[in-house]
């Protein structure tokens, strides 16, 4: 798009023999009433637009950060018109729901803890090349719009997919290239000093991976996957630098937002002193249900003991007890090398699988991992 108010920047990713991919960011023309908005292009073929808005007043009665991420697919993005009786866009498909979750996971922890203003990030798929996945592009679009919005957000965040194809890690692989992959990872992260901090990884092996490996394809061993994470860092850095350029030109100053911490340091100190050594017996209970019941009893006891000192702050005291429990549990695992259920840090829960558990239906299965 062109115009006097349009600003853009781009990142070029070199995949060697697989060619180059160009991600371009653009802002200043669409959704000017939103706190922040941005267009993200992948090779000028696939386009995702993202808009970020925030409420002016906090939701004080919430004990969580009310962030909503939505991805809206448009039929015209693929050159189609809805063919049903109601010529409207339907409910989000599976791919859109998974893309929204992929965005939420790295962006949510980047907001300052204790924020209670409602934030909505809406991504719209405007155009899509049939050979390009749009989900990781949407991560970058959402990060760009949120970074421009003047919110307490420690971005920008870059996202890419890395696929192991013919022994090489390829960024932003096409669908046709993924048919030759033995492993792929969606990775998101941000630049921290001279390094890139990985914030989210979603990895999987394609259904045909065994066929490719048996035909001589590279096996995704632990060391090979680690190489893939390292290969993603220059890509994420390039994406973050392109976003940072636009933030410097068009970003709003961070507004004054109130924060509501789960508990105060004074409350945590008081809770820790009140608990004393009473957490150790709780850590020794192997059965999860019994352990939870014992922790609830301990929490109620501590809250009652401190009620006079901290009136009408039962919820914050309970959160402080939970924080003290997590800290003690982590210390116990690191020092003793044993988790609460008796497993070592490298042991997994018992896994069982059974097929044909229901009568009459064509197929049924039961998969269990420990008590889950």
Predicted regions and their residues:
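Extended amphipathic alpha-helical scaffolds
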Residues: 1-55, 59, 156, 255-372
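Residue-level signal for well-ordered alpha-helical segments
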Residues: 2, 15-19, 76, 80, ...
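Alpha/propeptide regions of enzymes that mature by internal proteolysis
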Residues: 2-14, 18-21, 35, 47, ...
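Glycine-rich, flexible beta-strand/loop modules in the N-terminal catalytic cores of phosphate-handling
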Residues: 34-120, 125-132, 197, 201-214, ...
